[in-house]
């Protein structure tokens, strides 16, 4: 009998001054059940001006490579830099505020799926108890079973918790022109679709532990909308993006002019209501459309 094929999984974590101890401990639990023909490495890329106080402890305790970029690289560039530093056959990208729901089986589930897939998305979960706007919106929009995500596999791609063959990623990496928060995974999923890469969705969720205040979350939402507008102008996004599709309908019917007026009249009030404790997904979606209507949007042409 021939020797079994050896595979290596590189866990890639982009962070900004986050305490990654709980995530590393969860990964350690998963290592115990890792198939015998798989090995593991962990790489963290930190863009905070100051190195993590626990960096030396992490490197010793969890045998990880800690990359510090005090001048910042941007979200896409940071992930790409981590990937280039990796030595694995496959990459597992986890956000810094992710925590596997089932740590004992988390890595094994990915290893099994990657044998027959180039890109695998595990899914998002939220712990019960929090009533923050971020968690309310997340539970309604991001907690989607794998069989539902599979219906539109590329549109439902999320960079929060996914694995990919390293060879595929190096050909189709994150767009480094996006420096700030928002829609980098939307663009990445679309690029995979254009490249005819199959995206496989499985039930292998991680909790999203984001603890942003309501105001911080809306600030991030504003930034994400601004990023989306820039992508539209550059011709990098098509109408499979739901918010863009809705906006295009408003443009075609002329209703976008009404939205511009409503933005002046309502946007600040809606923001105050959302920060003040009102938990309405419909109102949040309206807030995003109003933010978008504040831009002069000329649809760019994609250059293939």
Task: Kindly give the residue locations of the regions a language model identified.
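Acidic donor-binding loop at a coil-to-helix junction in glycosyltransferase catalytic cores
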Residues: 180-188
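Acidic donor-binding segment of Leloir-type glycosyltransferases
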Residues: 27-68
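A recurrent flexible, glycine/aromatic-enriched loop bordering the glycosyltransferase active site
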Residues: 145-164, 180
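Glycine-rich, basic loop-to-helix element that forms the pyrophosphate-binding segment
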Residues: 55, 69-86
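N-proximal low-complexity "stem/linker" segments adjacent to membrane-targeting elements
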Residues: 1-29, 37
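Short aromatic/hydrophobic "clamp" motif used to bind/position activated sugar donors
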Residues: 91
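Conserved donor NDP-sugar-binding/catalytic core segment of glycosyltransferases
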Residues: 99-134
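Non-catalytic, C-terminal membrane-associated alpha-helical segments of glycosyltransferases
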Residues: 223, 240-304
């Amino acid at each position: 009998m021939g020797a079994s094929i050896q595979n290596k999984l590189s866990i890639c974590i982009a962070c900004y001054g986050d305490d990654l101890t709980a995530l590393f401990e969860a990964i350690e639990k998963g290592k115990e059940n890792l198939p015998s023909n798989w090995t593991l490495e962990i790489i963290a890329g930190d863009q905070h001006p100051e190195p993590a106080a626990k960096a030396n402890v992490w490197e010793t305790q969890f045998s990880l490579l800690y990359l510090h970029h005090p001048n910042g690289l941007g979200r896409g560039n940071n992930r790409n830099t981590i990937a280039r530093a990796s030595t694995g056959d496959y990459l597992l990208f986890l956000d810094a505020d992710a925590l596997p729901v089932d740590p004992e089986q988390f890595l094994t589930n990915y290893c099994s799926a990657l044998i027959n897939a180039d890109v695998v998305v595990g899914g998002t979960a939220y712990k019960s108890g929090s009533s923050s706007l971020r968690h309310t919106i997340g539970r309604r929009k991001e907690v989607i079973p794998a069989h539902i995500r599979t219906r539109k596999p590329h549109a439902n791609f999320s960079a929060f918790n996914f694995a990919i063959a390293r060879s595929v990623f190096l050909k189709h990496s994150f767009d480094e022109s996006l420096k700030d928060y928002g829609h980098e995974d939307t663009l990445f999923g679309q690029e995979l679709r254009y490249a005819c890469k199959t995206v496989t969705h499985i039930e292998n969720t991680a909790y999203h532990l984001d603890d942003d205040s309501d105001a911080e979350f809306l600030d991030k939402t504003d930034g994400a909308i601004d990023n989306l507008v820039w992508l539209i102008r550059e011709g990098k996004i098509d109408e499979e993006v739901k918010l863009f599709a809705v906006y295009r309908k408003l443009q075609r019917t002329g209703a976008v002019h009404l939205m511009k007026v409503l933005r002046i009249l309502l946007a600040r009030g809606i923001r105050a209501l959302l920060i003040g404790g009102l938990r309405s997904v419909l109102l949040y979606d309206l807030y995003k459309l109003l933010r978008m209507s504040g831009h002069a949007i000329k649809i760019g042409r994609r250059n293939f």
